[in-house]
Swiss-Prot record:
This is Transcription factor ABA-INDUCIBLE bHLH-TYPE. One of its GO terms (molecular function) is DNA-binding transcription factor activity. Homodimer. The gene is AIB. SMART domains: HLH (SM00353). GO terms for cellular component: nucleus. SUPFAM superfamilies: HLH, helix-loop-helix DNA-binding domain.
């Protein structure tokens, strides 16, 4: 088959291979048309999405939850070939601690491309897959994505895959009937699946595949987790298929151009890609690998989901102790068995504060480690609080849209106050803002230092003024008044000259002060001390101006008179 006939040019193949890997790229190019023949032939479990969400959105007591959960469901092509196709899935973004682990485990940014380039390439790949697999431009979800992370591209691109029995990770798992547990898929040299490259780029280290009679459950985590047989048995029991009545295969007359159904999802309308395929954002909880070691002493991870009332019979088939009211079921992934209690009154009661009146009796399932918790009301998930009178909070899609709108508004506000912007992208704007803030901080520091210096000078000046104020003595003599000003030598303007005279070993005989218009005259009469070197005019001037002694000092002006016995 000529690849160009399928709408794949050389540039498309290069971009898809760089983002998804060569194995995934080759598979998608070869099957982008043949998938039109896939139809769901087995009934689906109405609670499948809730069960998958319980594994991802409900952390256990150790704050652990899986990063993604995908159920590959048994499907059949029109030619009668049995394959495993996308049944449903749930995924979330790594939290801060997990994100740091992803960076240390595997970093594809070292391949030479900038993050913005990777974003454009991922969006382009999703748009290409959407069109080739029968989606229309009106419902192209990739167009509305502002940012596509490695986790999102891994999860969203996975929905276009299917596996023949015995091929790929899920296909081999289903054919053998044995589970697969990879504790370090990132550093593994072998490719467990066509999607290995995408899983590694998303930093997925632990990959678990559990076969059931309806398909294969695939779980993934960025943590490296040791194998837990109790977990395998628990999820195997929970995901047993309830509906075994085959569904009639759609006839050829229902094919009205393009793809009618792909992996059990109607792609002919505007709801080809349901909102449940969105990737959840970061959880606030923290988990450490040491917490996982609790699986050896009945402290394994716990997850919950809210099944419908008709799930009661299924849970009873695996020895689940249930109540006829609405309830919430949790899976306790414990390594060893836990004794079951058939009497709800003997179940352990969770302690509640005085402000919480809701009681939740718990019963345990022996061996499988499944916990049933009775709830009168379904608890709300963490997230945005209800607003405008809504009883339920916003779904993750609308909440994420509003979050991004607020974030964009703040970027616009930031752009308006930063004077010099190098580029218009957000990363450059943040860099310019950081530089501008640092520049302002430097200016503030300089101004603070100047203010402190000015305050110190004023304080010293005021201290000198107060402490060393001259003493004024006034005496009246006949018609004259004698004003005598007495001040310390250190604070007197002529103190430097007098000190220079003392250093020159001369004695001050007399000092006079006179005023002529705007000029003040200081007259000093000095005398050389006995035994000292002869005093010359040059020596005396050098003593008065020590800082300019190396050069020719200015001669005293007419306003300065120096006389003495030389």
């Amino acid at each position: 088959m000529n690849m160009s006939d399928l709408g794949w040019d050389d540039e498309d193949k290069s971009v898809v291979s760089a983002v998804l890997g060569h194995l995934a790229s080759d598979f998608l190019r070869a099957n982008s048309n043949s998938n039109q023949n896939l139809f769901l032939v087995m009934g689906t479990d109405d609670t499948l999405n809730k069960k998958l969400s319980s594994l991802v959105d409900w952390p256990n007591s150790e704050n652990f939850s899986w990063n993604y959960a995908i159920f590959w469901q048994q499907t059949m092509s029109r030619s009668g070939q049995q394959v495993l196709g996308w049944g449903d899935g749930c995924c979330r973004e790594p939290n801060e601690e997990e994100e740091s682990k992803v960076v240390r485990s595997y970093n594809f940014n070292n391949m030479g491309a900038e993050e913005e380039t990777w974003q454009d390439m991922r969006k382009r790949v999703l748009q290409k897959l959407h069109r080739l697999f029968g989606g229309s431009d009106e419902d192209n979800y990739a167009l509305s994505l502002e940012k596509v992370t490695a986790t999102e591209i891994f999860f969203l691109a996975s929905m276009y895959f299917f596996f023949n029995h015995g091929e790929g990770g899920p296909g081999r798992c289903y054919s053998s009937g044995k589970h697969v547990w990879l504790s370090d898929a990132v550093n593994s040299e072998s490719d467990y699946c066509f999607r290995s490259f995408m899983a590694k780029s998303a930093g997925i280290r632990t990959i678990v595949m559990v076969p059931t009679d309806a398909g294969v459950l695939e779980l993934g985590s960025v943590w490296s987790l040791p194998e837990n047989i109790g977990l395998v048995k628990s999820v195997q029991a929970l995901f047993m298929r309830r509906v075994t009545q085959p569904v009639m295969v759609t006839s050829n007359t229902n094919m009205t151009g393009g793809i009618h159904k792909l992996f059990g999802q109607d792609l002919s309308g505007a709801h080809a890609y349901p909102k449940k395929l969105e990737v959840r954002r970061n959880l606030d909880e923290r988990f450490t690998p040491q917490s996982w070691e609790g699986y050896n002493n009945n402290k394994g991870p716990t997850f919950g989901y809210t099944p419908q009332r008709d799930d009661v019979k299924v849970l009873e088939n695996v020895n689940m102790v249930v109540d006829n009211n609405n309830y919430k079921t949790q899976i306790e992934f414990a390594g060893s068995s836990v004794a079951a209690s058939s009497n709800p009154s003997t179940n352990t009661q969770q302690e509640k504060s005085e402000s919480c009146t809701e009681k939740r009796p718990v019963s345990l399932l022996a061996g499988a480690g499944i916990v049933s918790v009775v709830d009168e009301k379904r608890p709300r998930k963490r997230g945005r609080k209800p607003a405008n009178g809504r009883e339920e909070p916003l779904n993750h899609v609308e909440a994420e849209r509003q979050r991004r709108e607020k974030l964009n508004q703040r970027f616009y506000a930031l752009r308006s106050v930063v004077p010099n912007i190098s580029k218009m992208d957000k990363a450059s704007l943040l860099g310019d803002a950081i530089s501008y803030i640092k520049e302002l901080q430097e200016k503030v520091k300089i101004m603070e230092d100047e203010r402190v210096g000015t305050d110190k000078s004023l304080s010293e000046s005021n201290t000198i003024t107060v402490e060393e104020s001259p003493e004024v003595d006034i005496q009246a003599m006949n018609e004259e008044v004698v004003v005598r000003v007495i001040s310390p030598l250190d604070s007197h303007p002529a103190s430097r000259i007098i000190q220079a005279m003392r250093n020159s070993n001369v004695s001050l005989m007399e000092a006079k002060l006179s005023l002529a218009e705007d000029t003040m005259f200081h007259t000093f009469v000095i005398k050389s001390n006995n035994g000292s070197d002869p005093l010359t005019k040059e020596k005396l001037i050098a003593a008065f101006y020590p800082e300019t002694s190396s050069t020719q000092p200015p001669l005293p002006s007419s306003s300065s008179q120096v006389s003495g016995d030389i």
